[in-house]
Structures are given as structure tokens and as C-alpha cells.
Regions:
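Active-site-proximal N-terminal segment of extracellular/periplasmic enzymes that hydrolyze or transfer
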Residues: 1-31, 40, 80, 186
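Ser/Thr-centric signal marking residues that sit
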Residues: 2-4, 20, 38, 52, ...
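Active-site-proximal cap/lid insertion segments
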Residues: 4-17, 116-155, 159-223
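Short clusters of hydrophobic/aromatic residues that line enzyme substrate/ligand-binding pockets
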Residues: 10, 33-36, 61, 68, ...
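Short, solvent-exposed turn/loop segments enriched in Gly/Ser/Thr/Pro and often Arg
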Residues: 12-17, 30-52, 67-68, 88-99, ...
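Alpha-helical packing segments of well-folded alpha/beta enzyme cores
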Residues: 22, 71, 75, 153-160
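Loop/turn elements at helix/coil->beta-strand transitions in domains of secreted/extracellular proteins
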Residues: 31-34, 82-85, 166-170
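Catalytic-site neighborhoods of secreted/periplasmic enzymes
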Residues: 49-146, 193
């Protein structure tokens, strides 16, 4: 799972200017959805639907910053109850409060592999934490792939797969990238220099005929 990735940001959906060979391979060898729509445009509630199979208005997570309902089970809990090893590595955003998470593994997931964004920040020095949350200034030579959250999530995922390859397992790898601040090491930080997406009519929509809540999420002021 990636964060804030539009359909036109991957090659398998027709944008040949995007170089995404691994995602394209997943689409070729797995399932590529042509008519899939999120039930909620906000991160936390959308994730709550994916991992519980229930609508946000049913599971209690109607906006960011609030936790799932206390009696709501995730897919990790249900599969663990049936003897399947479950791992969750990456951004969680379902425990309420801080965007980065609480650093605590919820019920139903392997605590040895739990690695939300709070866990990542705990590994960094004070200066590194500042760097990790700034807009991309990553042209300096000491900025490495190993520094990024995505790289560290991937390393843990590989270890999980190696450990449980002979067992029934369910693994979620949830990258915060390409969500801002969009840190990107070389050589990827120059691959799309000068590239611009085609403008969308939705970008200039003033939303005056849309529900008030939609206007609020877009930053409009109440009158």
C-alpha cells in the first residue's frame, strides 16, 4: 500500500511517462482494478474500511485523528484467530492522535515486525528527524535510500517473508511515500525533473455546488 498515489502516477494505468516497473509487474501478475473507488477520501477512514471491511460511519473512524471503535476487529485479528501469521509494517493511522502513530503494536499483528512511523522516528537522531519531515532537499550526497522510511519498511518486509515463507501468512506493507514531504534519494530525485501532470478540471473546481464538508476539507472558510 502506498499513500496519496493517483491512478495516473503508475505506468500500468496508461501513463507511459511513469517508470514503475515493480507496480506494473504486480498489476500484470495479480489484479488490476479498473472501477475501484474509495469509500472515503480521507486517509484514516479509508484505511479503516480496508482493514475492517466496514464503513467508517460503522467502525467509528469518521475522520483522521480518532481511533477505531474498541469492539471493531481488523483483518489481522480475524486471521490471527484462525492461525494465520499476520504482519503489518508501515504507516497505520488507525490508532488516533498523532499522525505518526503510537509506536505500539495493535492486537492481531506480529509485534516483532510492527514498524509504524513513530518507530521510525525513534531510530533517528534529532537532526535526522528534522530532515525526514522537510520538503525534498535531497540532492546532498549523504542522503541515502537507507535513510528513508520506505527502505526500512521494505527491509523488514523481506525478513518477514523469509521467516514465514513456509507458513500461511498475511502481510501488509504500508508506505507513507509518496506522501509529502516526498523525500527521494538519488537517482530517483532527478528522474522527473521538468515533468508536469496534465491539469485536471477538478483542480479548478470552486466546489460551490459541493457539500459543506467537502469544502472544509479543501480549505474553504465558513461564511
Amino acid at each position: 500500500m502506498t499513500d496519496t498515489t493517483r491512478k495516473d502516477m503508475v505506468g500500468c494505468y496508461g501513463n507511459k511517462k511513469m517508470f514503475t516497473p515493480n507496480l506494473d509487474a504486480l498489476a500484470q501478475e495479480g489484479i488490476r482494478y479498473e472501477n475501484a473507488y474509495t469509500c472515503q477520501p480521507v486517509c484514516g477512514p479509508a484505511r479503516s474500511a480496508i482493514f475492517t471491511g466496514t464503513f467508517p460511519h460503522s467502525n467509528g473512524m469518521v475522520t483522521n485523528g480518532v481511533p477505531l471503535g474498541a469492539n471493531v476487529k481488523t483483518i489481522g485479528q480475524r486471521l490471527t484467530d484462525n492461525g494465520i501469521k499476520c504482519g503489518y509494517i508501515g504507516k497505520w493511522h488507525l490508532d488516533g492522535g498523532d499522525y505518526f502513530g503510537l509506536g505500539c503494536c495493535p492486537e492481531g499483528w506480529d509485534a516483532d515486525y510492527w514498524y509504524d512511523m513513530k518507530c521510525y522516528l525513534n531510530e533517528l537522531s534529532e537532526n535526522e528527524r528534522v530532515c525526514s519531515r522537510q520538503p525534498n532537499e535531497s540532492f546532498q550526497p549523504d542522503f541515502s535510500e537507507e535513510f528513508t522510511y520506505a527502505h526500512r519498511c521494505s527491509d523488514r518486509a523481506i525478513r518477514f517473508l523469509d521467516q514465514y515463507k513456509e507458513e500461511d501468512f498475511f502481510l501488509t506493507v504500508s508506505y507513507d511515500e509518496p506522501h509529502g514531504p516526498s523525500l527521494c534519494p538519488a537517482p530517483y530525485n532527478t528522474m522527473y525533473r521538468g515533468f508536469k501532470f496534465e491539469p485536471s478540471a477538478k483542480f479548478t473546481d470552486d466546489l460551490k455546488n459541493k457539500p459543506l464538508m467537502q469544502q472544509l476539507w479543501a480549505g474553504d472558510k465558513l461564511t
